Amino acid sequence: MHVGIDIEQFVWDPYASGIQRVLQYLALEWPAGDVQADFVIPVRGGLGLLTPQQAGELLTLPFLPREPDVDLRDAVNAWIAEAAPLRVKDGDLLALYDAWLLPEVSYLPSVLRRFELFSRCVPTVMIGYDALPMTEPANYRFKPGSNAWVSEYFRHLANADSVVCISDWTRDSILTRLRRDPAKAISVAHPGGDHIPIREAVQPERPVFVRLGTMEARKQPVEIARAFRTAVDDHGLDAELLFIGGHSASDESINEAIRDQVAHGRVRWIQGASDAEVHDLVHQASAFLSIGVEGYGIPVLEAIRLGTPVLFDGVQPAAELMVGRGARRLNSEGEKGLPGAFRHWSDPEALTQLSLERDPQAVPTWRGFAHEVVMAVRDA
């Protein structure tokens, strides 16, 4: 069996994200066996075909150290030019494959038209991440004229022959919000965290709470910062709150609120950190915060591997998998309960006990994830 895997979206938007971590390890862990794979990319004059090994190299580029002024798209294009992948014409692609896999979210017309074409001829499979543009629209600002393609992507997610979801929550949201026929194949495969080497826990002199991710409303950065400020100003909390991640592209008021908290002290906001820098910052923290709505939450698994216990609340599928093994639900009843949570988990004894629960060997593996995707392709 031969499957084509469309990663055109990555070539046009190759910035390190949770989805691109999934793509990276889907390629790196694609098993040798009876399901052979080509990763399909756009090249001058048609499309290029990469082996899983080649695709793994390409998809690793966003996670490598680079100078701040280097445009990652230039690095990707240079890699493709040097790799000189096997080229085919668009019209010849259909004859090559027994199945077609779209492993990432894409609203590109070329990607969606290609998927539509394959859906008429061979089984089609998608990796489903979430339906958040449908359920959390405030977090998204689509380019003018793109709404029809956004709808087209979710139509395919509802109708593909098989969907591999990254969590039970994702599966349920696709079935209910997108009204996917439950008789169609739909499965769950948990992305891994074992790309991070295990580190021993450390405790800084003053407690540090770290939160990783872009400033999206669904991740509640403003609520976290306000609650922390209340704990500091009203209850004398001696701790630090560290935000790591990019600014909100959909709501400037979120960025302004976080900058205001930074100006008042005890709160830091680091943007543009490299992978290695992020890992060191998380490793050096007392606890990792994951609050709000996540389709999955790979950083939770990374934190546990890095020696840092996780405190979470809201929809947090990856954290739920690790309850009692490095993750603890806060049950803070929203923002009003967070100041008390900050005070409680600043206690060194509480943090030590929480750290002792960590079981970094228990995080899901990328090999297991890739195996489940291959099985879905085989059975589609």
Regions found by a protein language model. Name each.
Residues 1-380:
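Carbohydrate transferase catalytic cores enriched for Leloir-type hexosyltransferases
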